[in-house]
Amino acid sequence: MPSAQSASITIVYMGDSITEGQYVHHSLRWTTLVTAALRRQYEAGGSEFHFFFNRGVSGETTRQGLERFPRDVQNARPEVMTLQFGLNDCNCWDTDLGLPRVSEAAYRANLVEMIDRARRFGTRHIVLSTNHPTLRHRVLAGGQSLETRRKHYNEIVREVAAATRVILCDIEQAFATIAPEQLKDMLLPEPDVLHLSQAGHQHYAAAILPHLQRCVENIIRREESAA
């Protein structure tokens, strides 16, 4: 295994409330679990070789994320970035007469621009995630449930990942192994049934951690080869 002593790596977790870990103690959030696992695996002798920033903001869409991107990502110049948005983008408010908060076309464009900007500022590896299943089946003002719309926006995520050649972490597929009657244990109870529970964060962390481990190992090997 490569030694972390050869590289100083910054990772930014960029996203909405799912990345922020809303309503769950910070020690139980998937970003904290992943950070702890990476530190245990790659840091030696108690020295700090890695820097982690959670830049998840509750309630935000890709449009709002793009507006704060210079401050929250570009300024950090991370080697690795995780990118997760969509559950707010696909939502349809009554006050918008059924229109999504962010259209499918704009959602796609916003993801691509964030990827382009991250790369321009030196990000070597980008992990783009689909969004997990929820139990939000009530029909929204636009005529579809949040669950139906989530699936549409997840397809956009997959298409963007393929087109931009970033790493796809298919969280939806990772949760597909969970029986429908057990999904409620992965989510906060009614009336939420959208945000991840402690068990949900653990499952999410297990799905995304291998991608980040490969990113870190790739960077460390490149640093050692250049030394």
What are these model-predicted stretches?
Residues 36, 40-42, 48, 64-227:
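Alpha-helical cap/lid subdomain in secreted, periplasmic
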Residues 1-58, 63, 68-77, 183:
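Serine-esterase "nucleophile elbow" of acetyl-processing enzymes
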